[in-house]
Amino acid sequence: MDKRLLSLGLALAGTAAAAQERPNIVLFLVDDMGVMDTSVPFLTDGKGNPVLYPLNDWYRTPQMERLANQGVRFSQFYAQGVSSPSRTSLLTGQDAARHRVTNWIRSEGNNRDDYGPYDWNWEGLGADDITLPRLLREAGYRTIHVGKGHFAPFGHSGEDPRDLGFEVNVAGSSIGEPGSYLGENGYGLLRGTRSRAVPGLDKYHGTDTFLTEALTLEALAQVDSAVAAKEPFFLYLSHYAVHNPFEIDKRFSAHYQDTTYSQAARGYATLIEGMDKSLGDVMDHLEQLGIAENTLIVFLGDNGSDAPLGGSHDIGSSAPLRGKKGSEFEGGTRVPCIIAWARPDSRNAWQQKYPVLQGAISREIGTIMDIFPTLTLLSGAQAPLPPAHTEDGYLLWSFLRGDKNPWHEDTFLNHFPHQHRGSYFTSWRHGPWKLIYYYNPDHPDYPQCTLFNLEEDPSETHDVLRQHPRIARRLLREMIDRLRRDNATYPVDFEGKPVLPREDAIR
């Protein structure tokens, strides 16, 4: 950590420890990090006990372990399958079928493919949309964006996170990946992919400051500024890591010398550990400022793993889960989520009102849409929303204190009417059952469905549709009803006509 930040933090600590009107919030978002990209075991056995797998031994994330010991981690937490849909869901509390940002957003414009819907929301979020940072800012929070944005294309209002409710924006733009992680390369401006150069970090150009470290330093400086102004803050620290390019973070390369892994896989592992160090730096800084007990941390991945291990649909990058980022399988949408107070203290008034178990695992189904209502309640930013803005998320506070929530549905909709590793599909999970519907827009009269029991077959290796056709038909009806409710957009056939899901697809 920068010694200047440490000195400033110690100077501010004496004035920050007093009780404050509202808690601070740190949303620590990691790009392309799946649930297995960590030494923290998220997956459990039938009794709810954590199970270590080989990937947990490969990655080194001691700070995630530290955070998990302080709070609750979710074994079944879902995000959308690619970046922009998830980030839009995070800021709006709506699922992708409803907000229609159903694919990743290309900076240069509409990236619709041959059978993709004409009316998907390729323009992303805009200045008129209701967003989490906008509500928090209106409630008196200093809203800070540091890192990846990817909310809208170049030239559209949502390109700049400040148009979405953030008071401060550092390094956020329309780009979805960095041109380079290396300060020597100007993060893509001097060398690398210039069209994906990370903006706003010129003072680090030509130095050996890795991008993850630069963003961390900038985030801590912004926290210092908010504390000095005695303002509650919402820090949205959105790392470009661990998205490709899988450049090696030399600070951690000595830990990954096993040549049975490719250079890309070793580079990916260093990106993971660099992200983890950033988390620890943030936690340490909150302690030094004396505000840790008044600060909630939400750690989250934005979609499934893109680790360069195995193929797109096999059990490799997310083992024992199948698939990876952009696929229809669990490895494409299951993400790490840890929620904890930065310093647990049962005497703290905020922690008494919003208790979080320590070292606990929740096996309840949670989704990225749940973050919106959970944080608006905590912050006091709850306000009557316009009827046009319907939330799809539910409060997580019951789960965080170890209780059930009868109002929280055990469902997850993943609607992806585009081409990727998994193409033109909708998946619908309800309880242990998961239905995948393939539209097959090139042959729309022949849709396909598969059914998995995730409790018995979490690796999705056994399609049990023929054994349970009644369950499959019930899930199909539920899925169609949900898509209709959301006014979803669909793939099109070769004539440009929407290909809607068919209730007779399962006979």
What does each of the following model-derived ranges do?
Residues 21-26, 69-75, 138-144, 164-167, ...:
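Loop/turn elements at helix/coil->beta-strand transitions in domains of secreted/extracellular proteins
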Residues 168, 173, 305-330, 340, ...:
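C-terminal cap/loop subdomain of S1 sulfatases and analogous C-terminal strand-loop tails that border
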Residues 101-142, 149-231, 239-248, 266-269, ...:
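Formylglycine-dependent
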Residues 20-23, 30, 35, 73, ...:
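Long, internal low-complexity/basic segments
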Residues 9-18:
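Hydrophobic h-region of N-terminal signal peptides that target proteins for export
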Residues 232-233, 238-239, 274-313:
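Metal-dependent active-site segment of extracytoplasmic phospho-/sulfohydrolases and closely related
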Residues 54-61, 78-82, 119-130, 205-214, ...:
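A short beta-strand-to-alpha-helix junction
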Residues 45-87, 93-97, 142-144, 164-173, ...:
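Short, structured active-site-proximal loop/turn typified by the sulfatase FGly-forming signature C/S-X-P-X-R
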